């Protein structure tokens, strides 16, 4: 193994000089002697000098320290030994529970599966969240994005999805915390522990306080662990179905921007790295299902200043099967989850995939909400009395639908005091179909707020009339 010496340190960027005939390849990992720091080669500058990004704090590094070329990319532990553990970007345990007992180590830079190995599925993944199941259903083995600005509930929605899917799902889950709050990572660990599913979850964290190199690579570390579970065949020749949760994809892009600036690349639109589309593609193309197993991924995507045309969320859109858009306007009405049913999409929205009843109900709900949206200006200027009877009925049903989309979450029980509700897809379709048919026109709209199934809304209305 060749050795070089550090010649320059600028923040997280470290230049290392090697003999000209022993220059490491791009993405090879270097170990710095006397420290726990790993460097990843990003550029070859010529004359035997390589420019690297430090995966860890560069405090205490100095010139002329020796760096050894490991002659391979960063490798992380994979397999059953990672389950129930919290690891950093290099696969080192950070949960103070001893070493990770891994059967194998895989490099984090890998090629995406070939076209002939990939497979697509039209099987629906029920989430128990009414607005998602009805308006933007998820596919098993698909990619889902939760888009939203600051404070509209991306992480809470993701935690509820983990609660509803990962606990009911008998397969394995991998959670990659990319540049998010350490507190949320801690909460997630205890949530999994309390619900006895910790032994089915591998957790990889590169949080807000870590250098950009860690935040840029931690998503790849988590993905590599998920790929192992998908590709490693059991006795029957099948891999596993894996859930991959990434919170937050925007921080992955942001870390790429920081690294790009540190490496001296010319920024492109809004200051992002010129390689934004390529970096996103490298990650997203690997998150796919093969003939042996599947990866279903749910990714939170922060939307800077609520602008969906920002290059980062706009680049992410192209890779997803379902997009769940969280709206600040809906959150301001106190309707949670604050999903915008008119702005959320799904490739599964096809009568041949989800069935005619589901498709027709979703279309009717969408038309009713769209009509209400168009009438809002008239109502604001002239008031409800100026509307025709038909329009009044549409507005009344739309307001009931809006409120019926709200739902108490299991993960928010501690804040709200009301028990969480899981609503099956069948009950969801039945409830919204009945509202559109006018079966509940006589009930007050408050009865539909924060309930589970339609029966609970009727019960709530009866209680309200009894009190009155």
Curated annotation (Swiss-Prot):
Cell compartments where the protein resides: Cell inner membrane
One example GO MF annotation: ATP hydrolysis activity
First-level EC class: translocase
UniProt-listed Pfam families: ATP-synt_ab, ATP-synt_ab_N, ATP-synt_VA_C
Main location, first listed in the record: membrane
SMART domains: AAA
Membrane topology: Peripheral membrane protein
SUPFAM superfamilies, sorted: C-terminal domain of alpha and beta subunits of F1 ATP synthase, N-terminal domain of alpha and beta subunits of F1 ATP synthase, P-loop containing nucleoside triphosphate hydrolases
Keywords: ATP synthesis, ATP-binding, Cell inner membrane, Cell membrane, CF(1), Hydrogen ion transport, Ion transport, Membrane, Nucleotide-binding, Translocase, Transport
EC number(s) given by UniProt: 7.1.2.2
List of residues binding ATP: 148-155
Catalytic function, reaction form: ATP + H2O + 4 H(+)(in) = ADP + phosphate + 5 H(+)(out)
Cellular component annotations (GO), alphabetically ordered: plasma membrane; proton-transporting ATP synthase complex
Function: Produces ATP from ADP in the presence of a proton gradient across the membrane. The catalytic sites are hosted primarily by the beta subunits.
Family stated for the protein in its record: Belongs to the ATPase alpha/beta chains family.
Binding partners and assembly: F-type ATPases have 2 components, CF(1) - the catalytic core - and CF(0) - the membrane proton channel. CF(1) has five subunits: alpha(3), beta(3), gamma(1), delta(1), epsilon(1). CF(0) has three main subunits: a(1), b(2) and c(9-12). The alpha and beta chains form an alternating ring which encloses part of the gamma chain. CF(1) is attached to CF(0) by a central stalk formed by the gamma and epsilon chains, while a peripheral stalk is formed by the delta and b chains.
Protein's name according to its UniProt entry: ATP synthase subunit beta
Protein's organism: Xanthomonas campestris pv. campestris (strain B100)
